[in-house]
Amino acid sequence: MAGASLKSVQRWLTATMIAVGMQLSTPLVAQAEPATPGWREVWTGVDASRHVWLLYGGVTVAPHGDIFSEGVRLRVAGGYGGYTYEGERRGQMQAFNARTAYAEALVGYYKQFGPLFAKGFVGVAAIEHDVDPIDPENPVQGQEVGPKLVAEFWLNMGSSAWSQVDLSWTSAHQTAAARVRAGYRIWGDLSIGPEGGINSNDLGEDARAGLFARYAWAGGEFSLAGGFAGRFLEDAQSLQDPYANANWLMQF
């Protein structure tokens, strides 16, 4: 049943992304002309560490204006990945391999308050964890669907410095995430700075701290990040697991 549920999440995610891609596609000829800012934002990325990997992507649209103006936002997103962990079961160490997939649909609003830019979303999320072999002591298994809340903030601190905070929570496996970045533009729109984050669910919390580089241009951005993470499961390990992240975003 768990495998069937995971496949259903994957099929839903694939169908949604294909449908959105077909709807948002535009002729290449239109890109040759200088145009007003677009109303679509598409992103994709990969996140990996020694025990965890995740491929993710999503689309945000502004149905009543361009992507930089205040107003309603619609978003669909999802991802697929895997992870491993160990635990003592029946007096001996047991290794577990897991696959995970998620999909979400959200509606929200984008508002500017001077140098502060804020987005808030509400919606529904489906998250699946398929653990092999079945772990009787792991509460995060199977598929759960529940409401989701998202808050995103960007603050310009002068002409060169900025900070970013992203927060999310869903009742599906009590999954939550928080990420903080502080950037400084060292040349044009090339920024570098520190980042930190926490990811949690019913199984426990993972924390990370590292550095990132972000390059932005008219209509897009690309960022790379790396550092160390800690998997706070049974023995609350310190931050000693290297991680890397790459993210690409386009607005059109």
Predicted regions and their residues:
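Intrinsically disordered, low-complexity segments enriched in Gly and acidic/Ser/Thr residues
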Residues: 176-179, 184-210
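Outer-membrane beta-barrel "beta-signal"
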Residues: 52, 211-217, 238-252
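Outer-membrane pore/translocation modules
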Residues: 72-175, 196, 226-230, 237-245, ...
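Outer-membrane beta-barrel architecture
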Residues: 43, 58-62, 106-108, 150-154, ...
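Cleavable N-terminal export/targeting peptides
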Residues: 1-39, 252
